[in-house]
Amino acid sequence: MENNDTGVAESVFIGGMFVLYGSQYADILEHYGRLAGMSDAEIASEAASVRAEIGQVSKAVKTAGWDGEWFVRAYDAYSRKVGTHEDTEGQIYIEPQGMCVMAGIGLDDGKAQQALKSVKERLTCDWGTAILAPAYSTYRIELGEISSYPRG
């Protein structure tokens, strides 16, 4: 097996970033669009378009990106979940939990609260918060560098 750069992998973490920063972009448009020479109609149209895309990505993250108790990290180039309870290693990653919660994904249905609870239970210890758990025991070429991180 080799690392497959097909461009079809999808990151739930990046989906959360899109929702968070897309929302901020829409707010910036509404507050400062006139200073950029935009008309009120252009501002309203662009902000509505951005918010519609945000809604679609947020919905996709809540459905395809939810693993039951936390957000998955991604789907690899073979459409396999990365960061799922279905695997024996690398079940949960910190990045999508924080990013999706900061973006407000799952605040309305308890997913955000559950994701943070899972972080506390599965990633947090006396020395801080781990990047992922459980750590990978061998290098996985399809995942790359993240599979070489030591425990903790």
Each language-model region and where it sits:
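Acidic, mature catalytic/reactive cores of soluble proteins
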Residues: 1-152
